[in-house]
């Protein structure tokens, strides 16, 4: 995305220390179900159709081997922020993205 590209160019352009920089939208930490619900709601108003699945249920109903999932997987933006780059709020960026996407889908 544009935000990720800007973050990468910022880190490279400022000669930031070598290392791993988490790069994701800022704002409230949400579950994957919350994010999917926000996408569906913003895209076509049916976010209520997204049904969360607990990790226990996911593992219980999986067919075949399943990769382990972390209990808490929020990314830490502090290293990116320490070199002077602040990621925009993911919910605002989602709204902006869908504004640009909808006309393309209607054609």
Regions found by a protein language model. Name each.
Residues 26-30, 34-75:
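Terminal hydrophobic/aromatic helix or amphipathic segment near a protein terminus
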Residues 1, 32, 86-90:
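Amphipathic alpha-helical segment in the mid-to-C-terminal domain
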